[in-house]
């Protein structure tokens, strides 16, 4: 059987190999054949199929796939259960948009049952596209039996976990101020509020309001507290003002800048400069006239904040009176003088700090009541003022809540040329009433809903919470045991998040999601948390026995079915389910348990696959899935949910901008894979930058990967296949002992073992970029550009002997090992490479590289000394090539010698051992060694002021002058070792090469290059003999090109005829006739006066006429 020599198209390899995988069930076998082996557990973070996949999903799934494939090849059994995240706000908002309804229409225009059915259908809308991408990119995950979060079994496991929280008294109900999204109609958790991009810079109207003091003998009648707010819409709900007890405040006599009325105002002394010009300090109050540009002011008195506590003031906007006394100054521990006035306006219904300090001080909230006696604030859950706020009743408090049509209608209603927001009109109202001291636009960062992109409100809600604060310290400690990649994300972003943890708001006032399994009596005195379907059946039976009318259908655990189930309390009271759903992030965080329907089934399976050895998702999941996994596992089971995690960075466009359909810079993953192939796409994404860094995705980068890495690897394989087929090499012979192989064989095999170690270590440390780059460097620099190039003649010259067999075996081993090492990153191409080799040699008893074992280091093949000297040969050759390029002297032109300054005997011996190799590689006649470079280089030296300055600051100038005067031999001494620099006062300063900057200038006739401690001087003088030899090498090159153009086989012998040119060329051809014939497989070379049927070939500035005949 022959090795495959067909040209390989990367774009087609994926389809070909995928068909092979399907036909042979390779993925299934990769799991089944490891049965009984140690397990490696991977958790798939469930995507939602209600949106299409993007190029960033290719990145994320490649990272996941790499380590699952690697661990499988290491012998672990790696089950990869796929999953779908099917509940929550994203689905509901999409359905509302498609149906043209809002949340308020559900239950009116459409039943809850119909609505949820639409959600169930919508959530799998793009499943086929996700499945297609999964297959195309080679992501191995079980799509046949995925977990789906809307299925009853999954929900039942979630209920079990919630009951665990409830029994541990970690689940409670509280009436608190929570982030609330009017656009979505539900409260949000703190981790939802901290998703990337939720805080946006906005330009709002801010106002410094004047709160008039009630009659007080210590103050004038026109005295006001100044309090600043960026949310003027909350001012109708003001019921207190907060000061810092130890902050210094001042009473200032001045004039209102809008009404010009005389006022006395109180504010923090430290913030005077924000409102008063220093130039106006000495102006006369009596001389002030309305409209004067500078408003005079005078400080009358100062107070500590604690002296102001208890002072009462008039209600600023008296739309609704509280039932108990309010409107007085209280102390607040959060008050500062960083901005504002040092006095904080307190609206307990719209701020957590406000509610806390108001409660401590006995200050009531400004609330009204509905028909059932339930209290609610002056803004409804759609974000509109209630009827009590008569001037603005029914108006949205945030401009962003209005559509363009609604805004235009409101403008017309206002009778204005331009729409003015509620904040703007409240500010105008205050100005006119002498109740505003300063109104301006203010840019600040404000939280927005992660799904609607609309501003949130801080709103009083009855919500269920998981008491994460009770386990905060333990969650912090457990996090320290997790291997985060990068570490900074675990310590910083995630660690800081845990350090500042607040209780988890679990409640969602929506319809499509996992219902909260808590039933409560109407008075709230009794409740039951249901943890299983069986338990629910038992409780329904109890309710029926107690004579309570209840639904009994529990085929579907969603709303509205569970809403109709009424249970009975222990004391006989009816209990209805709390109507909330739970946070969708709890759904995904429950997947380690719910994917197996634990604890109702698969207990052993769960125990063997918990916690996860590895997970990976985008960095945005730090406060999403990563957190919920960690919180549930840590709080309930005192364990981490995952041991190793990669937090992927963003995939940006090539200019570093976020991809956006609106901008038009989105890269289509399907088109990319179809055009470039999945392997090149994956390899580019992994090797371009570590996965946790942001990737500037550039299609040109994939093209470069195709050319440089896959092109080089394929050419190397094609070279091997061509000659192996000619010689019928099938690896049937016994392995040639290492000691009997050439030094270059032993070197590349040693480098291969070093590569195996480096790649295995990189994969094991979750460093795929290091692994990919190491493989790439080996293939391009060591295997192709060095080993194959230097050993070409062994493959196509001479008889099929032991040396040739060794060359074939060595190159085969390298190719096969590279296929195994690269398989996790480039699964299609590496499987084809492996199969193309193995179908001939039959060396491996498996049909796919993904069923093979990962290579292990063979210590016997490692030779550090050999690797070192070959590395020296490569580095020296590279320096000489760089000089040739700079001097425009081609490699085919021989040169006489190089000089290498060497001070260490071991280093000299190592270079001498590879002298012949260097000479052949860079086309020179001799390598000579010198102990310094003074004969070929002029050196200059100057101090490294940055380094020396840290140690000898005071003496730096003197040291600098002394260094500048050093001689050539002194500079050489510094390069060799530590040099003692003596100053005028006798002080001795040790100087190393790090303390100075040494620069070189070439001497005519020589050219010098240095890199990494190696210096090479090249003699660039050309003698006639060297010129002639260069001409001969050029002729060999042109003959080889003609052979190729004629389609001659490697073994074909030829006759060469060349028309004479000038004396130099004729002499060169005659003197080097034997060399030319040997190199070109020619049995003769003839020079003739005239060649009528020859072919013209260009050679430098000459034209040669030559003919070759078979």
Swiss-Prot record:
Chief subcellular location equals: cytoplasm
Does the keyword Chloroplast belong to this entry? no
Superkingdom of origin: Bacteria
Mention one GO molecular function: isoleucine-tRNA ligase activity
Cellular-component GO terms for this entry: cytoplasm
Q: Which UniProt keywords apply?
A: Aminoacyl-tRNA synthetase, ATP-binding, Cytoplasm, Ligase, Metal-binding, Nucleotide-binding, Protein biosynthesis, Zinc
Where is the protein found, in the record's own terms?
A: Cytoplasm
Q: Where is this motif: 'KMSKS' region?
A: 658-662
Per the Swiss-Prot or TrEMBL annotation, the motif 'HIGH' region is positioned at: 47-57
Kindly state a single biological-process term from the GO annotations of this entry. Answer: isoleucyl-tRNA aminoacylation
Catalytic activity annotation: tRNA(Ile) + L-isoleucine + ATP = L-isoleucyl-tRNA(Ile) + AMP + diphosphate
Q: What is its EC number?
A: 6.1.1.5
Which of this chain's residues are annotated to bind ATP? 661
Cofactor(s) needed by this chain: Zn(2+)
- Name the residues that span the membrane: none
Q: Which residues form a coiled coil?
A: none
Q: Which family does it belong to?
A: Belongs to the class-I aminoacyl-tRNA synthetase family. IleS type 2 subfamily.
What this chain does, per the entry, is described as: Catalyzes the attachment of isoleucine to tRNA(Ile). As IleRS can inadvertently accommodate and process structurally similar amino acids such as valine, to avoid such errors it has two additional distinct tRNA(Ile)-dependent editing activities. One activity is designated as 'pretransfer' editing and involves the hydrolysis of activated Val-AMP. The other activity is designated 'posttransfer' editing and involves deacylation of mischarged Val-tRNA(Ile).
Q: What is known of its domains?
A: IleRS has two distinct active sites: one for aminoacylation and one for editing. The misactivated valine is translocated from the active site to the editing site, which sterically excludes the correctly activated isoleucine. The single editing site contains two valyl binding pockets, one specific for each substrate (Val-AMP or Val-tRNA(Ile)).
Full protein name? Isoleucine--tRNA ligase
Q: Which organism is it from?
A: Cytophaga hutchinsonii (strain ATCC 33406 / DSM 1761 / CIP 103989 / NBRC 15051 / NCIMB 9469 / D465)
Query: Gene symbol?
Result: ileS
């Amino acid at each position: 059987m022959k090795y495959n020599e067909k040209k390989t198209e990367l774009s087609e390899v994926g389809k070909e190999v995928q068909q092979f995988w399907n036909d042979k069930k390779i993925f299934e076998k990769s799991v089944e054949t490891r049965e009984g082996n140690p397990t490696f557990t991977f958790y798939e973070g469930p995507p939602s199929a209600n949106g299409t996949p993007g190029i960033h999903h290719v990145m994320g799934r490649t990272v996941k796939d790499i380590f699952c494939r690697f661990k499988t090849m290491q012998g672990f059994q790696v089950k990869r259960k796929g999953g779908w995240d099917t509940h929550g706000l994203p689905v509901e908002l999409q359905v509302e948009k498609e149906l043209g309804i809002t949340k308020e229409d559900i239950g009116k225009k459409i039943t809850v049952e119909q609505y949820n059915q639409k959600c169930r259908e919508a959530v799998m809308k793009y499943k086929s596209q996700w499945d297609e991408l999964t297959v195309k990119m080679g992501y191995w995950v079980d799509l046949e039996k995925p977990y789906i979060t809307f299925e009853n079994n999954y929900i039942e496991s979630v209920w079990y976990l919630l009951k665990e929280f409830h029994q541990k008294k970690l689940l409670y109900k509280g009436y608190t101020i929570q982030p609330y999204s009017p656009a979505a109609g539900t409260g949000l958790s703190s981790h939802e509020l901290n998703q990337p991009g939720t805080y946006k810079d906005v330009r709002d109207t801010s106002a410094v309001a004047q709160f008039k003091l009630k009659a007080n003998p210590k103050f004038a009648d026109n005295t006001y507290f100044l309090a600043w707010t960026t949310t003027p819409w909350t001012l109708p709900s003001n019921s207190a003002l907060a000061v810092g007890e130890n902050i210094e405040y001042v009473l200032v006599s001045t004039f209102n800048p809008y009404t010009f009325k005389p006022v006395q105002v109180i504010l923090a002394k430290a913030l005077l400069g924000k409102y008063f010009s220093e130039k106006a300090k000495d102006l006369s109050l009596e001389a002030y006239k309305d409209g004067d540009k500078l408003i005079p002011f005078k400080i009358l008195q100062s107070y500590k904040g604690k002296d102001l506590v208890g002072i009462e003031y008039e209600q600023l906007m008296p739309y609704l009176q509280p039932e108990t006394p309010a409107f007085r100054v209280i102390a607040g521990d959060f008050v500062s003088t960083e901005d504002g006035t040092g006095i904080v306006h307190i609206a307990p219904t719209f701020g957590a700090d406000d509610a806390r300090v108001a409660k401590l001080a006995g200050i009531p909230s400004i609330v009204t009541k509905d028909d059932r006696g339930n209290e609610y604030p002056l803004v409804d859950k759609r974000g509109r003022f209630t009827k009590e706020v008569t001037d603005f009743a029914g108006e949205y408090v945030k401009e962003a809540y209005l559509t363009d049509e609604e805004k235009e209608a409101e403008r017309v209603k206002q009778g204005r040329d331009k729409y003015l927001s509620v904040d703007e009109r409240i500010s105008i109202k205050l100005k006119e009433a002498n109740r505003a001291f300063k109104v301006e636009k203010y840019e600040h960062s404000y939280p927005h809903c992660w799904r609607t992109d609309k501003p949130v409100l801080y709103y009083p809600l009855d919500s269920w919470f998981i008491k994460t604060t009770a386990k905060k310290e333990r969650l912090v400690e457990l996090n320290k045991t997790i291997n985060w990649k990068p570490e900074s994300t675990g310590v910083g972003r995630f660690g800081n998040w845990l350090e500042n943890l607040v209780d988890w708001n679990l409640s969602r006032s929506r319809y499509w999601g996992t219902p909260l399994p808590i039933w409560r009596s109407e008075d709230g005195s009794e409740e039951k948390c249901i943890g299983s379907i069986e338990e629910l059946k038992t409780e329904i039976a109890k309710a029926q026995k107690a004579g309570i009318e209840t639904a009994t259908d529990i085929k579907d655990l969603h709303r509205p079915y569970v809403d109709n189930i009424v249970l009975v309390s222990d004391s006989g009271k009816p209990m209805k389910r709390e109507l909330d759903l739970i946070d969708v992030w709890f759904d995904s965080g429950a997947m380690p348990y719910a994917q197996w329907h634990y604890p109702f089934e698969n207990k052993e399976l769960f125990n063997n696959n918990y916690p996860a050895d590895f997970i990976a998702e985008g960095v945005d999941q730090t406060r999403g899935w990563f957190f919920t996994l960690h919180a549930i596992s840590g709080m309930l089971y005192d364990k981490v949910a995952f041991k190793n995690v990669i937090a992927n960075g963003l995939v940006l466009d090539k200019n570093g901008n976020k991809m956006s359909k609106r901008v038009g810079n989105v890269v289509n993953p399907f088109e990319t894979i179809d055009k470039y192939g999945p392997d090149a796409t994956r390899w580019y994404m992994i090797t371009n930058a570590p996965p946790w860094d942001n990737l500037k995705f550039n299609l040109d980068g994939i093209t470069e990967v195709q050319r440089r890495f896959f092109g080089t690897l394929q050419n190397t394989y094609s070279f091997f296949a061509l000659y192996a087929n000619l010689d019928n090499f099938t690896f049937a012979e016994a392995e040639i002992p290492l000691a009997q192989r050439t030094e270059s064989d032993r070197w590349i095999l040693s480098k291969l073992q070093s590569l195996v170690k480096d790649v295995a270590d990189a994969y094991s440390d979750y460093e795929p970029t290091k692994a990919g780059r190491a493989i790439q460097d080996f293939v391009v620099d060591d295997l192709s550009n060095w080993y194959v190039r230097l050993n070409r003649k062994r493959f196509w010259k001479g008889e099929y002997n032991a040396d040739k067999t060794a060359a074939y075996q060595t190159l085969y081993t390298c190719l096969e090992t590279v296929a195994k090492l690269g398989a996790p990153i480039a699964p299609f191409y590496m499987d084809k490479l492996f199969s193309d080799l193995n179908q001939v040699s039959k060396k491996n008893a498996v049909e796919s590289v993904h069923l093979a074992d990962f290579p292990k280091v063979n210590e016997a093949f490692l030779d550090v000394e050999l690797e070192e000297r070959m590395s020296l040969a490569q580095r020296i050759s590279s320096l000489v090539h760089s000089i040739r390029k700079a001097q425009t002297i081609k490699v085919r032109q021989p040169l006489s010698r190089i000089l290498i300054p060497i001070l260490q005997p071991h280093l000299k011996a190592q270079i001498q051992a590879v002298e012949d190799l260097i000479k052949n590689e860079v086309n020179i006649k001799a390598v000579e060694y010198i102990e310094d470079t003074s004969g070929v280089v002029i050196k200059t030296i100057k101090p490294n002021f940055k380094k020396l300055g840290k140690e000898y600051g005071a003496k730096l100038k003197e040291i600098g002058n002394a260094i500048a005067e050093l001689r050539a031999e002194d500079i050489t001494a510094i390069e060799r070792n530590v040099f003692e620099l003596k100053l005028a006062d006798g002080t001795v300063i040790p100087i190393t090469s790090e303390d100075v900057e040494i620069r070189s200038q070439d001497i005519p006739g020589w050219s010098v290059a240095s890199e990494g401690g190696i210096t090479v001087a090249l003699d660039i003088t050309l003698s006639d003999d060297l010129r002639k030899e260069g001409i001969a090498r050029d002729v060999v090159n042109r003959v080889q090109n003609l052979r190729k153009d004629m389609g001659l086989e490697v073994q074909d012998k030829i006759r060469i005829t060349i028309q004479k040119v000038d004396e130099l060329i004729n002499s060169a051809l005659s003197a080097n006739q034997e060399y030319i014939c040997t190199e070109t497989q020619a049995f003769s070379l003839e020079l003739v006066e005239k060649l009528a049927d020859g072919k013209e070939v260009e050679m430098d500035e000459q034209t040669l006429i030559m003919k070759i005949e078979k």
